[in-house]
Structures are given as C-alpha cells and as structure tokens.
Regions:
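Bacterial Sec-dependent N-terminal signal peptides
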Residues: 1-20
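Catalytic-domain carbohydrate-binding cleft regions of carbohydrate-active enzymes
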Residues: 20-403
Length: 403
C-alpha cells in the first residue's frame, strides 16, 4: 500500500511540475549593416508568419534596412508592411544603429531613438513602441527615463543568446521595477536570479532555449510564468526557434513581449531594482588600441555635433540663422552608424567590402565632423554679421564663450 502512495505522490508531483506553462519570445536581430540578407530574408519572414499563425516575433532590425528592402524586394516589403501591425509582430528596438548605449553620450542615445523611430514610422506608420528588448547587451542605467519619454511602458534585461558582448546581472523573479539614477522606474523582465550562464559558456544564458533545466530552475525560484528568449540573427534561415505546433519544445507558447507582460505575467511587482552601470557585465576588448581609437573618434564627433547645434541656436536667436536640416540629419546619421554595436565588438571584421568596421568608423566620423564644422562656420558668419551691425549702430555687444 505504501508503494502505491509513493507512486501516486510521484506522479502527482511530476504532473504538477510539468503542467506549468512555459512561454518564449522569438524574433530577429540585425540589419543592413549587421547581417540582413536582403534578397530573401523579408520574403522568408512573411512566409514563415503565414505558415505558422501561432508564431510571434519581435523585430530588432536596423531602421535603415527597410529603405533597401523596399527597393530590392518590393512585394515582400508590402506583405510585411501589412503584417507589421498585426498581433504576430512587435518592434522592440527602434534605435537607428543598435548601440550598446553604455559607451556613448546620453544625447546620442536620445537621437538614436528619435531618428530610428521616425524612420520606422515612415515605413510602417501604424507601429508603436511599447517594450524595449534587444539581443545584444544594449543597456545603460539611465534608459528608464529615456524609454518613458519615448512612450515605452516595459523593458527586458535579458540577452540570452548573445552574451559575448556582455550581459546584465542576474536578479529577481518574474518582474522587477527597473529604477534609473533619476528615480524613473519601468516595469521590466529581468535576467532572473536563477538564470545561469550555460555550463562552460560566457556567451549564453540558460534562457535561450527553454530547456528542462531552465524551466525547473524557474519553478524552484517561484516564477509562475517562466519565459525564455532568442532573437535570431537575421542571417540565419530559421523559422520558429523552438519548433512549431505539437513539436514546439516543452509545449512553449510563442509570445511578443507586450502580450506576455500585459496578458500573462503577474503584471506588477514591488521589487524595485536600482540598476547601475556595474550591473552591466560588459565583455569588450577594453585596452586594445583599436577600441581606444574608435572611442576617441566617436567622442570627438559627439562633442562636435552638439557644439554645432548650440552655435546654430545662438545664431538663430541673434540673427534668425537656420542651418540646413539635411546637413544636421546626415551628421547625426553617420555618427549614429559609428556607434553601432558591431563597431565595438568586431572592429576588424569586414563591412560591405569597403575595409573593416574600424575603417568605416573613421569615414563616418570624418563625415560628421565635416558637416558639423560647416554648420559652426556658417553660424559664426551669421553672428559676425550681427556683431558688425551692432558696432555700426553703437548697440550693446554680447560676448559668447563657447566650451
């Protein structure tokens, strides 16, 4: 009799354990600069979405990519445009060039979102941006404030399949309130405290494939709605990452992050995580000469373009000078491209058969500097004209100190 009770208890235990539903967020990461085979990829995506109506994807594609897709594969572009606002698709990282964020200026991060959102909405007007989620460790402590200002409601601090550039500290359970240094909080799916690095690996966490071990750790940690994640490289020819239909691994349900957070997760939490820069465990080749050179080039351009904006504003206030918006936009565009995450992690890799990433960064920042210098000179000429007029009229003269 005791044996029967033991057997029944064992069966009940395992039935209860495996009855807990698992969820998974799939998607694509890349772009025209960071892997996106234009000739077939968009058609492949729309075909897979049509073939698997229960599949959901999050899109982290460089916004400029869609300019090329529209020209080279117009039919696939139009089909995806129809699907872009469906329940199957969520855009989760609209930044122009997917920067790491922790190694560039705050103003640059703001412009990455500003220009990226504008470009995506130009192609897909109905798309909104609710959840920030990335495949690379594109995080920084001040993001909650910036995300909230751009209308985001949620964030995700996982990057399970691409940790070679770094990963966030393991903390918390199903949800946390990510609190930035200014006190702004955003509801966030963290890299769970139980979400370990894969054995013998520093480039994957256990959340990348909803394995039995990962789901067991989640259950033991009290996570009611465990979720895994993998944004596939856009160069890979894979559809649903965990399989489809009855063959989906561990009966996982595909979700977008928005759908998961709003309709599946516990929805709110009292766990406030005061996330700092030290919680981003980065893994770049700091100290190498090429990375020092890239950092210097990017920082010079960041300072130069902000100086150009300040000068043009002063010239406008003094003399109604307006710089050419196309010049300012292009100056920001080339700087944003120089801030691409691949600039920092693979600087010696080739890019479009035009030398290495490091070579291209030099060209991009040189272009930004040239345009910014032109705006500064034009602003100074406008200010000088106003100064001479005031001298002739014996008016008050103001001295501008530029830092």
């Amino acid at each position: 009799m005791n044996k029967i009770y033991i057997i029944l208890l064992t069966v009940f235990f395992y039935a209860n354990v495996y009855s807990q539903q698992a969820y998974f967020v799939d998607g694509y990461h890349g772009g025209i600069y960071g892997h996106y085979p234009v000739k077939w990829k968009t058609q492949f995506i729309v075909d897979q979405l049509a073939m698997h109506p229960d599949w959901r994807i999050c899109m982290e594609i460089e916004p400029e990519t869609w300019d090329t897709v529209r020209v080279q594969t117009p039919e696939a572009y139009l089909r995806f445009k129809e699907m872009a606002t469906s329940d199957q698709v969520e855009f989760t990282n609209p930044t122009y060039a997917q920067p790491y964020c922790y190694n560039i200026s705050g103003e640059s991060i703001i412009r990455q979102f500003q220009y990226g959102i504008a470009k995506i909405n130009k192609h897909f007007p109905g798309v909104d941006f609710v959840t920030y989620s990335v495949e690379e460790p594109c995080f920084t402590s001040c993001l909650p404030q910036i995300l909230k200002q751009f209308g985001f409601k949620y964030a995700v601090l996982k990057c399970p399949n691409t940790c070679w550039g770094g990963y966030t500290a393991a903390y918390g359970g199903e949800l946390v309130n990510w609190v930035g240094p200014d006190g702004t909080a955003i509801l966030t799916v963290p890299r769970y405290a139980c979400e370990k690095l894969e054995p013998g690996s520093t480039w994957q966490t256990t959340a990348w494939g909803n394995s039995d071990a990962y789901l067991k750790d989640c259950r033991n940690a009290g996570i009611k709605h465990p979720v895994g994640m993998c944004f596939q490289d856009a160069g890979w020819k894979n559809g649903p990452w965990l399989g489809s239909g009855k063959n989906t691994k561990n009966n996982s349900i595909y979700m977008t992050w928005r759908d998961y957070i709003e309709n599946v997760s516990i929805g709110k939490t009292d766990d406030n995580w005061y996330f700092s820069q030290e919680d981003i465990h980065v893994n770049l080749m700091w100290g190498s000469q090429v990375l020092q050179k890239i950092a210097q080039e990017v920082r010079v351009s960041e300072n130069r373009i902000v100086m150009a904006e300040k000068m043009s504003v002063m010239a406008y206030l003094e003399n109604k000078y307006i710089c050419r918006q196309a010049d300012m936009d292009e100056a920001w565009r080339t700087l944003m491209l120089a801030q691409h995450h691949d600039s920092w992690i693979v600087p010696y890799n080739g890019l479009h058969r035009k030398g290495t990433w490091a070579d291209q960064i030099k060209r991009w920042t040189d272009s930004t500097n040239h345009l910014a210098d032109g705006i500064i000179k034009a602003s100074m000429r406008s200010l000088m004209k106003s100064l001479f007029r005031k001298i002739m009229l014996n008016s008050n003269i103001y001295v501008f100190l530029i830092h």
